[in-house]
């Protein structure tokens, strides 16, 4: 019996992208739910549906860009599709929110243009910040029409965590022992312990350390982004 390794690898990539898409979207909305103590999905308005649709497509786009090594011709079409529900509901979302969401898509697309040279440490930190902040900010602003500065503090742990997990895609360093990986790991661990729920902080750190140790295997087996999504949800509950 012959196994088509190429087909098997594509299936693993698709599995990783779809699961991460669900986990990332859940984490984005959970951050706001935990911060406010309210369910942002309690009232299903057209604005909520538009933001949820954008969240799902954006999360898929992030995983798609990473798993295709920033080089697929489908990146721009997927980004445009993600903006369609926002454009159709732009009157209810307001122009500033549309501009912020557009910034995420532009940032992701720009990271794929070799001439811009964003596949480096600057690009890593910039894209990680956009991935962490844009959707939660728009969800909160869309619900309450203002944005509290205190929410930025909760983004710090997620920013370092995102940079840690996206680092191998931007730097092409898949080994666990590298200066960048260790620095981001240390920064993430410190930021996590500033969260309010100590037990979940410990659980997050243990899973993070195991992920760091098994980094080459998780990347090769396409579990890396899935672990990333799971960790975000755990840390969301620690807020």
Write out the residue ranges for each language-model feature:
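N-terminal topogenic module of multi-pass integral membrane proteins
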Residues: 1-101
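Interhelical loop and helix-boundary elements at the membrane-water interface
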Residues: 5-19, 63-76, 110-129, 170-183, ...
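Helix-coil boundary and interhelical linker segments in multi-pass alpha-helical membrane proteins
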Residues: 26-48, 83-99, 133-153, 189-200, ...
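C-terminal transmembrane-bundle signature of multipass membrane proteins
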Residues: 26-29, 168, 182-239
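Short, aromatic-rich membrane-interface segments at the entry and exit
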Residues: 42-43, 72-74, 93-101, 119-123, ...
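Alpha-helical transmembrane segments and their membrane-interface exit regions
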Residues: 50-61, 102-114, 131-133, 154-166, ...
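Intramembrane alpha-helical segments
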Residues: 76-141
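Functional transmembrane core segments of multi-pass inner-membrane proteins
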Residues: 127-177
